[in-house]
Amino acid sequence: MNSLKKIILVALAVAISSILIFKENSLVAKLTFPVQAAVSQSLSCATKPDIPWLHTDGRWVKDERDNLVTLRGISFCGFNNEWGEKVLPDFEHKIAKVTDETNGWYPNILRLPIKNYHLDTFSLEQVYQTLQAGVDECARQKVYCIVDWHVVDGEKGADWRSPQMQQQTKDFWRYMAPRFKDYPNVIFELYNEPGYPKLVNAENWLNWRRTAQEWVDIIREQAPKNIILIGSPLWSQITRFAPKYPFTGSNLAYVNHTYKGMEESWPQEIGLEYDWEEVFGKAADRVPIFVTEFGWQADSEWEFGKGTTANFGRPIKDFLNQRPNINWIVWTYDSYCSPRLADERDRVLGEKKMGLFVRDWLQEEWVKSTNPVKPCSTCFADLLNSAEGK
């Protein structure tokens, strides 16, 4: 990336010099005068452009000019350290690590999880202050962020069907949505992983929709513009029903989570193999999809996620690269969750772990046209295209 920046600076210098050397009616001058007129725009790339509001349109996310957008990034795990829910996450500090280009990280979105049982220790206002620090840091770094209500059904008795969890979810969004409604970089993730019942059928999806639609409405009434991400039962795996039975509302997208080993939890009686194309690929042909969790680690402590770059990382990369309308977020940067990108000293993990592979992948994606926060390289390319009348 550093060599690319040097090339861009040299190209700018040559363009400006040519204006002084060539006559106004020369071919080179005709190409470079528009560039000179837009030099200030190019230089503004060095400070990163403002983040545009996003919206959904068909199967795509788009920016305010209707440019196609793909969001690709990293999730934190919701804990600050081994003390778990007894300490709120230090998002501001974490974000600085993974948006520093000198560290080689190039996400355009970060996921900020808040566990439901954080509220056993902290007030909604305290949780909001923690999230606000993270959201503000993301805004400063010009990256999008997901405010993630990170309930995992089955964890400490959580169950989306219980009156207690339904009330807690409504309380959370009534508090958070109006406070983040004016942030163009904020996306809301409704409920991380509804778990039960473990059925892959339309009835299960429709029962979930009947309950969760009220939560969507609460957010939309308070925050009319922010995209809302909607999961599904079986820990956000029955995404395939979203196109036929969508939720009501604007700027909605649907979530899938996938890990090595999830095929073992996939009900065999439905007569359908666990296959990315069937699980969420076909849905992505019709509605916007965010894979807000996936990852792999050969020695993962977790029952799911035990995979290698060869048997999971490269296949999922190939699958997602063929479908640029699917947005994706890798789980997780933090060393005290699994699978992980880095260790406790922020050393990026390689070999059979995913850190180096994902970091290189994000660098590749950063310069693509679907990145809504364009880097300097694409800013200058746009200027040249403009000068050539493209």
Regions found by a protein language model. Give the residues of each.
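N-terminal Sec-pathway targeting helices
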Residues: 1-11
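Hydrophobic membrane-insertion alpha-helices, especially the h-region
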Residues: 9-19
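Membrane-interface motif at the C-terminal end of an N-terminal transmembrane signal
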Residues: 19-31
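N-terminal carbohydrate-binding accessory modules
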Residues: 31-109, 360, 378-389
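Extracellular glycoside hydrolase catalytic/binding regions
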Residues: 53, 78, 87-90, 161, ...
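Aromatic-lined substrate-binding rim segments of carbohydrate-active enzymes
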Residues: 88-154, 166-169, 218-222, 309-321
